[in-house]
A protein has these predicted regions:
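A short beta-loop-alpha structural element at the N-terminal edge
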Residues: 28-38
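Alpha-helix initiation and capping sites
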Residues: 36, 54, 61-62, 89, ...
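Short alpha-helix lining the ATP-binding pocket of the histidine-kinase-like ATPase
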Residues: 65, 69, 73
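Conserved beta-strand-loop-beta-strand hairpin that lines the nucleotide-binding pocket
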Residues: 1-25, 29, 72-103
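Conserved short strand/loop->alpha-helix "switch" segment adjacent to the catalytic nucleotide/phosphoryl-transfer site
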Residues: 40-65
Length: 103
């Protein structure tokens, strides 16, 4: 079975207008079984090529897990016909994560 996740990664040596050097977007269904894979994909691609400490990696994984669980369980009420979108932006000193549900 193929994964229902839709991943897009954009890396730039020159930051875009918003200053993001790495942009990772991911769309997943409102299924809690997809959370682990989504967290792994976003973390791996967002931090690839950067000297992130174990603490930063762990914190990003916790933030993503909690935000996705909230979006799926509370926002979309586990409705499988709804999606959750993640946008992670890696700037020089900051990682911004946006999680959007359809609820």
């Amino acid at each position: 079975m193929t994964s229902p996740l839709r991943l897009c990664v954009r890396r730039s040596t020159a930051p875009d207008a918003e200053g993001a050097a790495t942009l990772v977007t991911l769309r997943l269904p409102s299924d809690v079984t997809c959370i682990e894979e989504a967290v792994e994909l976003v973390t791996r691609h967002c931090l690839a090529g950067h000297a992130a400490t174990r603490t930063i990696r762990f914190r990003l994984q916790v933030v993503l897990s909690e935000a996705l669980a909230n979006a799926i369980l509370r926002g979309n009420r586990e409705s499988l016909d709804k999606w959750v979108d993640i946008r992670a932006e890696l700037h020089d000193e900051v990682i911004r994560v946006h999680v959007t549900d359809q609820g």
